[in-house]
């Protein structure tokens, strides 16, 4: 009996910890250091100049994503200078600025000297011509050494993405890629995963491993990866931009997330998204590359941008996703040069109004999504009871008006039951003793309750 009581106390402590966590809403701020270095200015709502990392944290952002390039100095920017943005020193600085504000850290390793994306997965210059075996050693050593440097600097990432939008290949000499090359591509992924695993073991860290796809290819690629034995990861990250998406509704995205989560038992997160708030004004002469919302009918206004983000967050949350990250909301115009221009080709998609001194736009409200979510779901949650609790053979869901889809997960997040309630009763006789979360899908909302199996 004492052992049972001790177990129940530990389980309740774990539940309290879980309940303190919430849906992640964060930002990719990879360019922010360089924007600041080149004179970029950010203001708060009162018009006071402010630090962007401080502002995002104060507004409620809970995670910062930063990309890492191997040797960006191999590229000459539009102003004629070697590019140093997003080298390892820059990543360390960005992570320090984010961590001191209490935000979690998400790193995207591109395994290239510049942007890698669906059309390009070019390896670092220093790896050109290596045999497959030596290339694998290089991938392992590079991945491990990056994590070691970050850990030494006190900014160990919470999530590491192995590759960025790897739609048609991974770490190739050619650009664009020639398509997948199995099993060699599996070797590349798996050696990088092994580097993270070994680092975690040696340093007692718990960095999560992610892959990163686009919305249009995520379903196909997840299946392909499993077929090719690329499975040792925790998170599937998805890029979803209305401008680039083939989808014509957010429900299509929600269906994708639910399918990926239930089929592969992985956490699903939107790693990149973005929507313009204007397409009629410009802060500089660097042409903007995103001027509309594709198949989605959100108006190109500050309120339209905000409405899209809240609808997106609701969709991802209701589908079982763990969060969304907005791509480069702090990329305002400055003297910064990249490979193609000077200034920003994205200021019309940022979270700052360049027509009003770079004051924050309404889109910043998305970082309070957890607060609005809690208020919205509390009434439904308060009306649902699990009885008995603790329970041994079955639980009854009190307060339901009809049968609903349910999912039960253990304390590690593993799905142990995925079914429909029958007469509001769920058979739990075949699951081990322990603490569990039951998630009920009620009227397009997810209501979660905790219970103990004895």
Question: What are these model-derived regions, one by one?
Answer:
Residues 50-53, 204-206, 221-293, 310-321:
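Glycoside hydrolase catalytic-domain groove-lining segments
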Residues 1-21, 374-375:
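Bacterial Sec-dependent N-terminal signal peptides
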Residues 27, 56, 108, 160, ...:
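Conserved, mostly hydrophobic/aromatic
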Residues 37, 280-294, 299-310, 315, ...:
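Aromatic-rich peripheral "rim/lid" segments of glycoside hydrolase catalytic domains that contact
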Residues 38, 118-119, 216-231:
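Distinct, well-ordered alpha-helical segments
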Residues 376-454:
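C-terminal outer-membrane/trafficking sorting elements
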Residues 21-52:
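Boundary/entry segment of secreted carbohydrate-active catalytic domains
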Residues 55-208, 214:
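Substrate-binding cleft and catalytic face of glycoside hydrolase catalytic domains
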